[in-house]
C-alpha cells in the first residue's frame, strides 16, 4: 500500500471521471488536496480517500464521529480481482498503527449501492446508522469498523513508502 503522489493525480482523476455515475460529486481540487495531504492511497488500481477528523462531526442521523476517528470518503477500484479487499484491509491495519487515530473508521454509502455495501460487509464493516443528502432525496447508510490499536508495530516496516517525518 502506498500514498498517492502528485504524479498520480491525472491517472486517479481519470478513474473518477470514468465513474461519474458512482462519484458525481468528486471535484479535482478536492482530489489534489487529498493527495497533497497524504489522505489518498493509490495501489494496484485501488484509490482510497480518507480523513482523520480533527473535531466531532455528524456523519449519520444519530452517529457523530469523534476527534481522531477516521472517515473513509471514497473507495474506487478498476478491477474485480480481490485487490480492493486486500488494500482496504491494509488500510485498516495502517489506521490501527497511527498514534493519533482512534481506530474507529466510518464510511457513508448510498443505500441503493448494494454491491458496495456487500463489499464493506465482507470486509468486516457493520451498518450502524442512516443518513440522507440533497434535502432527503438521496438515502444513505453509515458503516463502521473498529480496528484494534496495534502500537507495537513500526509504521515504516509495515508500509515501506511511509514517511513518518510527515506526521511528527
Regions found by a protein language model. Give the residues of each.
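Conserved acyl-donor/pantetheine-binding loop and adjacent beta-alpha core of acyl/acetyltransferases
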Residues: 48-71, 134-138
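Conserved acetyl-CoA-binding loop-helix of GNAT-fold acetyltransferases
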Residues: 77-96, 118-122
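Conserved acetyl-CoA-binding loop of GNAT-fold acetyltransferases
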Residues: 121-130
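Conserved beta-strand-loop-alpha-helix junction that forms the acyl-donor binding cleft
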Residues: 77, 106-117, 133-139
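Conserved GNAT acetyl-CoA-binding A-motif
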Residues: 95-109
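Conserved N-terminal entry element of GNAT/NAT acetyltransferase domains
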Residues: 1-7, 149-168
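Conserved beta-hairpin
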Residues: 36-54
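Short amphipathic alpha-helix that is part of the acyltransferase structural core
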Residues: 1-26
